[in-house]
Amino acid sequence: MASAQKSNPGNYFEDFHVGMDIVHATPQTLTEGDIALYRAMAGNRFAQYSSAEFARAAGLPGLAIDPLHAFHVVFGKSVPDISLNAVANLGYADGRFFLPVMPGDTLNTVSKVIGIKENSNGKTGVVWVRTTGTNQRAEPVMSFVRWVMVNKYEMDNPAPEAVVPDLPAAVPASELSGFPDMKTWDMALSGSPYTYDDYAVGEKINHVDGMTVEEAEHQIATRLYQNTAKVHFDAHGQKDSRFGKRLIYGGVVISIARSLAFNGLANAGQMLAINAGSHVSPLFAGDTIYAWSEVLDKATLSDTCGALRLRLVAVKDQDPGAFAYKSDDGKYAGGVLLDFDYWAAIPKR
């Protein structure tokens, strides 16, 4: 007697429809152990995510989870339902961090499908979802939109009516939340004398340092977030893929590039919003990540705190001081891995 399949094959493009609500399994409680592992794997050096005493003096309740760390956990919860059969995660928009995530907090994740469009090849389609992470008190701690290219189950299945969501180019500075009172910020302990007043729109910052990513560590990082995407783990299964080997989770690139940005942006450690993001090209074990940033905008949030809108560009195996980005035809330059636009809090003088 044949039994019904009890394992999860993941959703294909045909399984999604606009308005679909998905409750993702396995809430995750984050601890100080998670903070230590994240620091070990991403190299995070920002003072408010390294020292409990500094964090309290800087207006946080204590040693908090880095917002990107929490983002990866919430993202990871959505993978089995959204992107287990994905070809690629294409981009991010309208990401907002509402509350700090503290050790002992438990993150739950839900998503709503807000857009869908079959690709012209008839083999894949793009699905847009808004994913929200809440804590154990059902308080939203973050929300973001991402879109992913997903395989169809059958190429001959009819295409659904296309719905493409209208997304903001950036989170308005007036809607940023969760920023601290930074009047007692200690420049000596933070590692930089530069504040909001020292950065100019259009300024580019070479973050100088590089970090080579190895096979084992990127898998440990991805498992930390309980991200189960096949392309990151199954070496045997990926032999017949487009690249013939495992891909490094794009979140690893974001976190390492962000950690490298400490050298030049040490006082801008708290991410307030994700405006946009694209994984431009793949990263593989043995590649080295470098990064540079451009100041896109500035905004005053309070008497003690400002925000910098930053474009973080990660490049592979090349000098970040060349500021590789796009050519005259609008195409990304060779070696560009990541184009990530975000707001960060920074103390004012």
Q: What does each model-identified segment do?
A:
Residues 2-90, 152-171, 176, 180-274, ...:
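Hot-dog-fold acyl-thioester-processing enzymes
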Residues 38, 92, 107-111, 127, ...:
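Short, structured motif recognition centered on aromatic/hydrophobic residues
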Residues 2-18, 101-179, 184, 285, ...:
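HotDog/MaoC-like acyl-thioester-processing domains
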Residues 88-99, 113-115, 270-281, 296:
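A cross-kingdom feature marking solvent-exposed beta-strand/loop segments within repeated
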